Design a protein with these regions (language model features):
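Long, well-ordered, tryptophan-enriched scaffold segments
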Residues: 259-267, 271-361
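N-terminal leader/propeptide and maturation segments of large enzyme subunits in energy/redox metabolism
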Residues: 108-132, 307-348, 436, 549-648, ...
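Long, contiguous, secondary-structure-rich segments that constitute the structural scaffold
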Residues: 549, 558-610, 683, 698-699, ...
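Active-site phosphate/pyrophosphate-binding segments
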Residues: 298, 319-450
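Extended redox/cofactor-interaction regions of prokaryotic respiratory oxidoreductases
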Residues: 169-256, 261-268, 292-296, 390-515, ...
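N-terminal export/assembly segments and adjacent metallocofactor-ligating motifs
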Residues: 2-307, 566-568, 727, 771-842
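Flexible glycine/proline-rich, aromatic-decorated loop/lid segments
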Residues: 274, 512-545
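Short beta-alpha connecting loops at secondary-structure transitions
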Residues: 280-285, 541-552
């Protein structure tokens, strides 16, 4: 049964706007509408006509509702630079991939945990009543805990989910499942897994999610900005909370200063990215995965030309004397000269020296992204960026130093003077029903190694200074999470998946993770429930009511109600809810911020006035801020969180771990595979980038049918390829191509462009896995999931993070029968099956 298509037709103007989303002009809009009063949540009922204020990862907006149907979306007037992705948000509610009903995989319904798990992915499901689905869920929780213990139950995989302080899918899952029993958890994430482990050792904090120096200060004080593997104009369209997009005004000012030659911007990137197109500047098209040789050569130049800051090195760092012998070749016989680096990086020695001199010749801000730490030995890049900033000696000064979060969460905006809201957290003081022993197995695992854990139970690995033993995972629960998008080496993952006895997915879109689940429960979208959220991420500009726009579609339920009903089955309903209804919790969250506001002089209206009124409060402006300023001004009183309190160029803690792939100081390690003359480039000559998309948030919005049509090529995810590489393969823009390596193959639509250096191609991550032969490892992906092609190995023994950007491929024009894209139509409904078949008794 298909969702009724109530979508309004997309005009040519809107269509072209979607096509142009990759350009900065389409990202940065103009001021919008005059304020309008939002409606109360109680009005969001069938037959309602009016406007509703709400928010999303893509910004705040007003939804026009006609006879209970959401028909139009208008950006919130407080957002000066809304993203075109707001056009796709309505389709999250209305699209063929909605999870409509509780569904059970057909063979699991027949045989329970003894089912033929090789059938997972064939997309054959049976609709069942909610009561039966939740009974199955509880039965499996009990069975796994009683049969194997907590180490066999994995309920730690969380991700972006949806905005809202109450309806956080991961929090709901952890709160509900932890009342039932302890489970295997995870550490780290896929975005910053390597950097977030190593940087606390080196710089004393995780750094990747931190607020950055205020842009006003940078624009006043900086001479040179080095953007290293980052594309903030593309990535700032989305936010962890509801972005206000005010930061784009700073990029407009930067573009003007670059144009007037007041600030120099240097982009170290093999791609002429959206930020470069928007702000201007110079490009150094470094070969992929060769940034460390380039950085070491810069360090060599700073040292040999006496351009480094000796006072800063002496007073704010430790270990420089142990690092420089490596740079000078005294430890391995290789002097890290610009000539040495040129052969690997493709950047001329003269350019490397000039770059070092430019960086040392004035105030320099190093702006690092996250892609470069998502490759094998990714820890080294994060470490080395801090080392270069230390050698320049400008850390803690206005407009100088380093930062790893400029492309994320409105970074560089001035944080308001307002309070912060809490959320719906875990339960304390209530003993779980099942609290068994882990029997020596790990209680947590590095998240990017969870498929390793499934594949190789009992294996011991090194991780961040400890040895852990993978448990025998038997059941996995995913709520608002799509590992069949963000994990690497899809075919390896499919093979591992057969070892799981039961998989539960709680979702509102029928993702590939649902296809490979046994129990699928339909959740509401953000737009079918009431909630509250912060407007602006680092800016904390205000508080926004997230009002229900339409009634829940089909049989979807809020995550709150799903886990409340599950907890009722084991007598923990009141512990889960805290004895409160959903709106009472939202009011409690608001009142907590209101009380906090009183203490800092910020007056807020009562919750009733807020919710029934405009549904938006704006906080007073805060003050400008310089990252690491307190450390620079008073290093003894404000030390970093490292072992020494200083920046650790050489880290004894890491050295003492004894890892050969992450030693006591930053080093160059060759990769398993690398383009431009590296390993396996003779077989697969093209480096595959799988960066964050400019049309989605990871895999979110990929199911928005009309919006997807504005950027697909030949109905597939685009692959961007250099003109020389395309000509050598007789490929033109618009061609359907096969992208392949030894791990798998995908179809994609070619976009031939000079923006990409020779030997470099890109498919944005988050493209939905759409197998030709569902559930079969090795089958071609009909839409273009890049993680069919990526390598699933840890960055090193330190972080064990994802190495997605260590991947080489080849491309050819596709000449076979053209298959339909399989990924966006929901499940195959099997009928004639008794929906009350007692699989739990098997």
């Amino acid at each position: 049964m298909a969702t009724q298509n109530n979508h309004k037709g997309i005009t040519r103007r809107r269509f072209l706007s979607g096509l142009a989303i990759a350009s900065a002009a389409s990202v940065v809009g103009t001021s919008l509408l005059a304020p309008r009063k939002a409606m109360a949540a109680t009005d969001a009922i069938t037959g309602f006509n009016g406007e509703v204020l709400c928010g999303s990862h893509w910004g705040a907006f007003r939804a026009k509702v006609v006879n209970g149907v959401w028909t139009e979306t208008t950006p919130f007037e407080k957002d000066p630079h809304p993203t075109v992705m707001l056009d796709a948000v309505r389709e999250v509610v209305y699209n063929p991939a909605r999870v409509k009903y509780p569904m059970i995989r057909i063979d699991w319904l027949k045989q329970g945990y003894k089912s033929d798990t090789s059938q997972r992915g064939n997309n054959r499901f049976v609709r069942v009543p909610w009561s039966q689905a939740l009974d199955f869920f509880q039965h499996e929780l009990n069975r796994v805990q009683e049969t194997y213990g907590p180490s066999a139950l994995y309920a730690g995989h969380t991700g972006w989910q949806s905005v809202g302080k109450l309806h956080n899918a991961g929090t709901m899952m952890k709160r509900g499942i932890s009342l039932h029993g302890t489970t295997l958890g995870k550490m780290g994430d896929y975005s910053t897994g390597a950097a977030q482990v190593i940087l606390p050792y080196i710089a004393g904090a995780m750094e990747v999610y931190e607020q950055q120096t205020s842009w006003d200060i940078v624009l006043k004080n900086t001479d040179t900005i080095v953007m290293w593997g980052t594309d903030p104009v593309k990535n700032l369209q989305v936010g962890w909370l509801v972005p206000d997009h005010s930061v784009y005004g700073s990029y407009q000012q930067l573009a003007e200063k670059v144009k007037n030659k007041e600030i120099k911007v240097i982009h170290i990137d093999p791609v002429r990215n959206e930020t470069m197109k928007f702000v201007g500047g110079e490009q150094l098209p470094v070969h992929p995965q060769s940034d460390i040789p380039l950085m070491l050569a810069i360090a060599h130049t700073l040292y040999t030309e006496n351009l480094y800051n000796k006072d800063f090195i002496a007073n704010y760092t430790t270990g420089f004397d142990k690092f420089m012998p490596y740079v000078m070749g005294e430890t391995d016989g290789i002097v890290k000269t610009p000539e040495w680096a040129e052969k690997i990086s493709g950047i001329k020695a003269s350019q490397i020296r000039e770059l070092a001199r430019t960086m040392a010749g004035g105030r320099t801000q190093l702006v690092g992204g996250w892609c470069l730490q998502r490759m094998q030995h990714g820890e080294q890049w994060a470490w080395m960026l801090v080392v270069l900033a230390a050698m320049l000696g400008q850390i803690g000064q206005p407009g100088g130093g380093f930062g790893f979060g400029w492309h994320y969460n409105d970074a560089g905006t001035i944080t308001s003077a307002g309070p912060l809201m809490s959320g719906f957290s875990g339960v304390t003081g209530v003993e779980p029903i099942y609290n068994g022993s882990f029997k020596g197995y790990a209680k947590t695992i590095p998240v990017a190694r969870f498929v390793d854990c499934i594949s190789n139970p009992g294996t011991k690995i090194q991780w961040n200074g400890s040895e852990i033993t993978f448990p025998y995972m038997k059941m996995a629960i995913f709520s608002g999470n799509n590992p069949f998008a963000h994990h690497q080496d899809r075919n390896r993952m499919i093979k591992a998946w057969t070892k799981l006895e039961t998989v539960v997915s709680i979702e509102h879109q029928w993702t590939a993770t649902c296809r490979f689940a046994d129990i699928v429960l339909p959740a509401t979208t953000t737009y079918e429930r009431d909630d509250i959220e912060q407007f602006g991420n680092h800016s904390n500009k205000g508080i926004l009511a997230l009002r229900k726009i339409v009634e829940p579609m089909f049989e979807s339920k809020d995550d709150f109600d799903i886990f409340r009903e599950l907890c009722a089955r084991f007598n923990r309903e009141e512990a889960f809810t805290g004895g409160k209804k959903k709106m009472e919790i939202i009011e409690e969250i608001y009142n907590g911020a209101r009380l906090q506001g009183r203490g800092i002089g910020v007056r807020m209206p009562t919750f009733a006035k807020f919710w029934e009124g405009d549904g938006y409060i704006e906080f007073p402006a805060g003050k400008e801020w310089v990252r690491h300023e307190s450390f620079r001004n008073e290093p003894d009183l404000e030390p970093l969180g490292t072992a020494s309190g200083l920046i650790e160029i050489y880290c004894k803690t890491i050295a003492d771990m004894g890892y050969n792939d992450c030693q006591g100081h930053p080093m160059w390690f060759e990769k398993e595979e690398r383009s431009h003359g590296g390993p396996r480039s003779d077989v697969y000559p093209l480096h595959l980038q799988s960066c964050h998309p400019n049309n989605r948030l990871h895999s979110q919005l990929c199911s928005s049918t009309d919006f997807r049509a504005t950027y697909t090529v030949a109905d597939r995810e685009p692959i961007y390829i250099n003109t020389q590489d395309a000509a050598a393969r007789n490929i033109k823009s618009g061609d359907l191509v096969r992208v392949f390596n030894g791990r798998g193959q995908v179809l994609a639509g070619a976009v031939v462009t000079e923006d990409y250096s020779p030997g470099v191609c890109r498919i944005h991550e988050g493209a939905w896995y759409s197998p030709l032969d569902g559930g079969k490892a090795g089958t071609i992906c009909t839409y273009g999931d890049p993680n069919v092609l990526t390598l699933d190995i840890g960055t090193s023994q330190l972080a064990q993070a994802t190495s997605a950007h260590t991947a080489v491929v080849d491309i050819e024009k596709y000449t076979g029968p053209v298959p339909e894209v399989t990924g966006f139509n929901g499940p195959t409904y099997e009928t004639g099956i008794d929906p009350l078949f007692p699989a739990m008794d098997k």
